[in-house]
Amino acid sequence: MKLNKYIDHTLLKQDAKKKQIDSLLSEAREYGFASVCVNPTWVEHAKKGLEGTDVKVCTVVGFPLGATTSAVKAFETKEAIQNGADEIDMVINVGALKSGNLALVESDIRAVVEASGDKLVKVIIEACLLTDQEKVVVCQLAQKAGADCVKTSTGFSTGGATIADVTLMRETVGSDMGVKAAGGARSYADALAFVEAGATRIGTSAGVAILKGELADGDY
């Protein structure tokens, strides 16, 4: 198994410096990760830094709270793509889901999907804040709205990916969508377990350590 192709090599910290982003890009080129995931302000820089490789540029929308309006999320998406983003990881409107406003949750996702054109859209459900029933419902809404993938976590809330959540999400969406486990893989064994549970992507800042068989520090 080429585990490197499952990994979105991630640096989303608000205090990330250019030299840290450059290090992320260098590691992505060396290890051939599926993508780098960076904040929107770094998309254009990342695109230039990955020219000549097959590493995708992934960025985040409505991040990390998901509480911006759908119009803002759509604008963020369009601008990110103009700047070179290949993949969009958007955060759902968690408050709307918790309030039972499923129409808003779905239309919010759909706004990003429509703004993305042919680019990959992953929907962050922030599983640590949801009941199992809410996880099932929002995965179904993401599927209905035309998203490509559902993702467990932002890495900025109360918890990251769990095997139970990845399993439930995979069972809910079937084989038609991707499932991204984010914020829970600290070792090669962790990453492998997520893949075996149904993950097609793993979001982590510890991709290099994972591939080296080391135990990584940190929380994403």
From Swiss-Prot:
<feature type="active site" description="Proton donor/acceptor">
    <location>
        <position position="180"/>
    </location>
</feature>
<comment type="pathway">
    <text>Carbohydrate degradation; 2-deoxy-D-ribose 1-phosphate degradation; D-glyceraldehyde 3-phosphate and acetaldehyde from 2-deoxy-alpha-D-ribose 1-phosphate: step 2/2.</text>
</comment>
<dbReference type="GO" id="GO:0006018">
    <property type="term" value="P:2-deoxyribose 1-phosphate catabolic process"/>
</dbReference>
<dbReference type="InterPro" id="IPR013785">
    <property type="entry name" value="Aldolase_TIM"/>
</dbReference>
<keyword id="KW-0456">Lyase</keyword>
<protein>
    <recommendedName>
        <fullName>Deoxyribose-phosphate aldolase</fullName>
        <ecNumber>4.1.2.4</ecNumber>
    </recommendedName>
</protein>
<dbReference type="InterPro" id="IPR002915">
    <property type="entry name" value="DeoC/FbaB/LacD_aldolase"/>
</dbReference>
<dbReference type="GO" id="GO:0004139">
    <property type="term" value="F:deoxyribose-phosphate aldolase activity"/>
</dbReference>
<comment type="function">
    <text>Catalyzes a reversible aldol reaction between acetaldehyde and D-glyceraldehyde 3-phosphate to generate 2-deoxy-D-ribose 5-phosphate.</text>
</comment>
<dbReference type="InterPro" id="IPR011343">
    <property type="entry name" value="DeoC"/>
</dbReference>
<keyword id="KW-0963">Cytoplasm</keyword>
<dbReference type="GO" id="GO:0016052">
    <property type="term" value="P:carbohydrate catabolic process"/>
</dbReference>
<dbReference type="GO" id="GO:0009264">
    <property type="term" value="P:deoxyribonucleotide catabolic process"/>
</dbReference>
<feature type="active site" description="Proton donor/acceptor">
    <location>
        <position position="89"/>
    </location>
</feature>
<feature type="active site" description="Schiff-base intermediate with acetaldehyde">
    <location>
        <position position="151"/>
    </location>
</feature>
<dbReference type="Pfam" id="PF01791">
    <property type="entry name" value="DeoC"/>
</dbReference>
<dbReference type="InterPro" id="IPR028581">
    <property type="entry name" value="DeoC_typeI"/>
</dbReference>
<dbReference type="GO" id="GO:0005737">
    <property type="term" value="C:cytoplasm"/>
</dbReference>
<comment type="similarity">
    <text>Belongs to the DeoC/FbaB aldolase family. DeoC type 1 subfamily.</text>
</comment>
<keyword id="KW-0704">Schiff base</keyword>
